[in-house]
């Protein structure tokens, strides 16, 4: 199904939230035995990296269509060493047909960047792409995709009970959302540190199903 790629209007205009940044989640990755790994290939830009406070330990975001960047958790879980320039093989099924052996495909990329781990640290982190390529490279995968929008709270919104804030936002949005309680409800942080990481206080996935065609 092809639907709007725009973020949810009620969230984009919400009094508590800053404008969103987007990650495209596209390809379910398989291991060498064609078992699902639970990790996703997608694409995001510098704006997402900045708002998500993602840290590149080595290298850079993909600039060319044969490049890929991954976080350490995804990289090591798939059995790679983690060296810049390493060849990464992405195994996937066209149109997400996981039970159709004839749909199995492989594409190779060169590792250009390694992020500090986030897929196993963020709650629901594995719903975000643990491996990213350029949008153009992503467009050749014949798979269903969705847009994930990451929102941050405005600096004026300060409270010790972010769960209540989230519930109010969820009521207003009426869309699929996720609450990262592993971060939001962690009380021992000083207030200054909480505000420094305000980017992750409200992480909302606004789903827009789209299909990339070859």
Residue spans for each PLM region:
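Hydrophobic alpha-helical transmembrane segments of multi-pass inner-membrane transport and secretion
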Residues: 189-214
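Basic-flanked hydrophobic alpha-helices used for secretion and membrane insertion
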Residues: 1-191
């Amino acid at each position: 199904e092809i639907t709007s790629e725009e973020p949810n209007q009620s969230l984009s205009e919400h009094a508590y939230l800053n404008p969103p940044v987007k990650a495209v989640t596209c390809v379910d990755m398989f291991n060498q035995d064609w078992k699902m790994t639970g990790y996703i290939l997608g694409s995001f830009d510098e704006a997402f990296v900045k708002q998500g406070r993602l840290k590149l330990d080595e290298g850079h975001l993909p600039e060319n269509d044969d490049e890929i960047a991954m976080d350490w958790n995804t990289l090591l879980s798939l059995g790679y060493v983690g060296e810049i320039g390493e060849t990464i093989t992405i195994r996937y099924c066209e149109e997400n047909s996981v039970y159709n052996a004839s749909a199995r495909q492989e594409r190779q990329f060169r590792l250009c960047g390694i992020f500090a781990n986030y897929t196993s640290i963020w709650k629901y982190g594995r719903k975000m792409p643990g491996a990213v390529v350029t949008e153009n490279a992503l467009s050749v995968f014949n798979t269903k995709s969705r847009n994930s929008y990451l929102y941050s709270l405005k600096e004026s919104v300060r409270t010790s009970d972010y769960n209540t804030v989230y519930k109010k936002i969820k009521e207003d949005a009426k869309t699929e959302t996720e609450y990262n309680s592993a971060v939001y409800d962690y009380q021992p942080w000083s207030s200054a540190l909480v505000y420094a990481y305000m980017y992750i206080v409200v992480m909302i996935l606004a789903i827009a199903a789209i299909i990339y065609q070859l």
